[in-house]
């Protein structure tokens, strides 16, 4: 197996910072994450979360599936003019989009509708034709969800990924009936046929593997394990010219969305799959996970591979014309590219999922690609040197190097889920901001949905959360399973508590990733049935109830204070405490006040720091945040631009932890919040509401 890296192409540039998210005087747009957008090409507005695209057989049109917060739709783009010429609504749509071999019909996955929608297509116009239900029940369940769709090469049968049933449904397009089902890996993402039609490949989002199935019976020919979250695939037949003669006859490129890698599997004449190469798309040699390669496209001559790197807002370019892949560079895109396609004239079309746009980009020559690559690097605040020296400077409690000690020995991280509170309903929030530091320019990453919680605990939202979140948020699919046992939802390096456990730190969990007992089974005071993350099994407070809007936060605070009293008796408190206070209003504010007061009056206060962050705020807007500690500055307003990744990185440095992703690694540390000499005056909570 060979390893190819794009990081070695790029030189170091000066880190730049800005003061407010939005258009920047330095060019482009500054994001709340501290990254910048300077997309190449022409930007065409679409709807929300454009996530897949297909070029018509005649090359004149590009169809785009929009599956975000707005009502789902299919956009038709004119390739010649690079403009949207039509948009057709659908009941639901998620990833699957394909033309019939003749190009006169289009098939769209119906997502939570558990159906496939058929349209006729003529001269750029879509007309609804038929609906192919994949279940017989009147109302589909959350498990009945259609993802990718693909025709066999002969155009006779349509194959559909049943995402939460871990199966492939085979539909006869003449009758619209399901004629067969095949089991496959967990969370089948993409279906790709072998050109001979005798077999097909399925990327398993949850298993980190690609499954190779025989076409007629669906029997498993083979399986190859790759990296986390394999998503898109691209097929390249033949062996490149050269003296080396490999034992494979074709290559299968597979994007690993929870890594910085694209995997290259060689297929032998005997149908064996072997990992022959890994294409690393990192911008620098030591960059942590966070590139999120999630979509692939080959150029018309099959010499270039384009790789959509979603979280890096870039497309990586690699030369695959030889036996060993050669990295060429990057192209800057709009925010969160989800798909890439190449037109007949070699222009590159990129869908920008978070921006809701399509970029039409002329094929860059070597000079232009070099300039584009430097732009991509300049757009990121991350640099490898930050892993060994965060640059926090001397005299404060935040170490600059991973192994340096801190004056702070206990970190308490409290995640809220409300917006900026008013003073009448939140006197403790406002009093804490007045007595300690008022963070006037703090931003939550990821927005108010599930993404915000992932950014606040894992320094990234996995591609599963990004792509499934809108469907659940708009209740097209009932319920949600983000992290609560969902095998495809895990982030690249786990969560803050995973990081701490790996480093051997003592840990206590209050309310994260737990299954609650039914209220009628809590007479003994036990609120938690079990932890949903194995790491949390032995460190979770059983009397601290998880998310349940009907349960008061004040009761949660009292459960914590009861354990704090036990810590006082033993003289031992965990080095990291993670706590979820999910409610809002006066109850929540009183609970926070009691927690802070309890810690501030305890023996642990001289070495404690309490970090409070709100996650349920639109990204780019100010979010509630507090830092309460003897080492926090007193009575000041801080206008430094910080975000949830900044808070995570600051806690990591205090605790001696490595960063989880490129986003906390490159985040601005909250050095201006702290002072070198401690002020141990305690905090007195405002009186809580009645019990």
Q: Where would I find each of the regions flagged by the language model?
A:
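Generic recognition of cysteine residues
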Residues: 4-5, 309, 541
